[in-house]
Amino acid sequence: MSRVIVKGLPIYLTEPELQKHFNKRLITTHATSNVDGLITDLRILKNREGKSRRFAFIGYKNEQDALDAVNYFDGSFIYTSKIEVDMAKSFADPRVPKSMKEKKREALKRLREKEEKLLEEKNKKLKVQDTKSKINIDAEIEKDKQLKEFIETMKPSAQTSSWDKITETAEPESGLAEEQELDDEESSNVNPLLKHALSMKKGDENDSDDEYMSFNNADSKAGSDESNEEEKMISLSELPVQNEESSAEPKEDDGLAKNEEISDMDWIKQRRVRIRENGEKVGEEFATNVQDKESEENSQATPAEELQEEIPDEEQAIAKIQKTGRLFLRNILYSSTEDDFKKLFSPYGELKEVHVAVDTRTGNSKGFAYVLFAKPEEAVQAYIELDKQIFQGRLLHILAADEMKDHRLDEFDLKNMPLKKQRELKKKAAASKATFSWNSLYMNQDAVLGSVAAKLGVQKADLIDPENSNSAVKQALAEAHVIGDVRKYFETKGVDLTKFSNLKSPSQRDDRVILVKNFPFGTTREELGELFVPFGKLERLLMPPAGTIAIVQFRDIASGRSAFSKLAFKRFKGTVIYLEKGPKDCFTKAASNEDAMEHDEEKSAKEAGPSSADLLESVSSKKTEDKEDEDEQVVDGPTVSIFIKNLNFKTTSQQLTDRFKVFSGFVVAQVKTKPDPKQKNKVLSMGFGFVEFRTKEQATAVISAMDGTVIDGHKIQLKLSHRQGNAGSQEKKKAKNGKIIVKNLPFEATRKDVFELFNSFGQLKSVRVPKKFDKSARGFAFVEFVLPKEAENAMDQLQGVHLLGRRLVMQPAEQEAANAEEELERMTKKVRKQAAVSEIAAMTRNAGKRKLDMEDEEEEF
């Protein structure tokens, strides 16, 4: 957590005054007046009227600064107000109280669930009542034979069987007949004739058709008239008018029948009546009522829907992330880099791409980024755990991003292209994913010969004589000469060439730096600039006078990636240019205006070539650097490291930097850490660290001054560190006895070729090219110089040189044994090592077989 909350502020305090107050502590702890960027966010909360609510949030870039602010400012005073400073909590923290919107949303959710339950209970009760009423009607019909006969008579002929009309049986009817009767009974609610018949049944349940009725008595005329009226056939005109109006015709004449524009079908639709199973009628009035109810429900549900639209649905976001595996980050720090997000998200899984959006006009960040995971489930886990968490003093907001647009061709489109075009496209696609490089300073052999020929003032054909057998040696020596000139030029421009030999992983490469190789001799700096400038602003474009290689540095990462993907293996002046990403921090000084390249034709014309002043400046700088090298003994490599052990586990890199930056020549200080297995996104100190200085003398002076001092209660111990990456590898290349081994030698190379190649760098003592039993070369050779210094010079000058198309690899060889006993001891060690390796291989190879044998023996028993 790197965000703090400050309570109890004066109501009149402004944000600049609050930042100035907290910057005082940062200036003291960091011992510098430039503390810009350490406070990433500062906000005083205000009400609707614009008045301060007397508390604020302050975001720090480092967690250590936030903890220091809490310990230092908590309980202190600003003017006359006592403030409380504490670590802020994120929205995902369960201890944070819920907002009013969340409370309203939960209350609406509870009401909705309650309404659904009540509606379900009501529907269940209605179903029970309907079933009971149907059962009662069926029972009444079964009891009364006259009513049953009447219903059977009123059925359509298609629904009544012929034998049912002739014979009457007392057996129960089939399930199908019962369903038909039930339908007729339900329709009685709408049919007035059947409804009146049922009402008649209730009035004379005790009457019987078997008894005769007398009509002769005049006294009983009135009673007989009443009974006759009941037994008469009822005409439709005598039915109540109310039922007809309610069932068929509307209450008011809408005039639709007189309207000629309305068709017959539209008029029928307006008069259509639908009968439900429970006997309810649905016409115009019922439809309007339903529409009114639906409109009321929609009007009541509008606030809830608005709240749901304002708050993103987490389930929908997770479903989208599961499809794309891509996250959208916003509210990030404008100075955040891709490496910061790689460290944050890499613990959750493999990352395919991390992209920070950059404004191409200014080169500054836009404040949002994209992270693409290899597996979508890992992206979902990162979204759940990191959304609304504090990162670099700000609340990180993560959303589900759309799927990345892919403009690549599919296999079907590739098959329709020529084979040559297919190979070019595949090479371009694989160039950005390449994790290795054969030779960083690779140069086109034709360009090398052209450069040497132009420098000597001869024709290129004169350097290579087809009748001479040592043409390959001449070409290798010419390449060595050009490589030496290129090295000197890059060193004067502040390029650290040792970084190129230590590239082991893609994470060590910088997307902004591109090495341009394999372009023809005669290519100018302006022509390369026109090739790269359309993709973005160039901070550097370094091209040696030899004109065989160049280094391009873009202002932002996005421009470098775009240029690399579009220009890799592009045809340029009849050749294919090779691009390679350079290492990080390969420049030791800032870029000058002369090295930059802008998209301006007039300016580019003025910068056609290096002026005499530039050449004199480069020569003078070289002389001053040579004098400095003579005065100060700088170890092999750009810096000298000091190993510090017995550090307190609470000591941070910032505290170590504050302790050692007062010494001259200080470069950087770092405490080695490891991931915390208990808490994700946190690290633990390993109890030791490293401090780098520019020279060995400065490092030894610091060791004598600081060795044995106490930091955070621990007495530290200091000593020089021998790094395997830079210094260690350079020390191994020192030939103590003047003998070196040359590997990757072409099989066509002879002893004479090797002798002529190395003879120009010193006096040779012996040259040996081992051969097989068929007298063919084994691919390596031994070269021994009289002086060890000459051997080191040859290894340095011939580094990266090609002989007959193969790059030579040189290493110091072991010194020959002084006597037979030493030779026997070496052979014994070698045999022991080979025996141990073969024994381990046999054990691993036979482990599975022994397991199978044991299983077979167990089965026998």
From Swiss-Prot:
It is found in: Nucleus. It holds the Pfam family RRM_1. Residues 176-187 have a biased composition (Acidic residues). SUPFAM superfamilies: RNA-binding domain, RBD. Residues 248-263 have a biased composition (Basic and acidic residues). Keywords: Nucleus, Repeat, Ribonucleoprotein, RNA-binding, rRNA processing. One of its GO terms (molecular function) is mRNA binding. Residues 154-263, 283-313, 593-634 are annotated as: Disordered. It comes from the Eukaryota. GO terms for cellular component: 90S preribosome; nucleolus; small-subunit processome. Residues 2-90, 325-403, 512-584, 640-723, 738-815 form the RRM domain. GO terms for biological process: endonucleolytic cleavage in 5'-ETS of tricistronic rRNA transcript (SSU-rRNA, 5.8S rRNA, LSU-rRNA); endonucleolytic cleavage in ITS1 to separate SSU-rRNA from 5.8S rRNA and LSU-rRNA from tricistronic rRNA transcript (SSU-rRNA, 5.8S rRNA, LSU-rRNA); endonucleolytic cleavage to generate mature 5'-end of SSU-rRNA from (SSU-rRNA, 5.8S rRNA, LSU-rRNA); small-subunit processome assembly. Involved in pre-rRNA processing. Belongs to the RRM MRD1 family. This is Multiple RNA-binding domain-containing protein 1. The gene is MRD1.
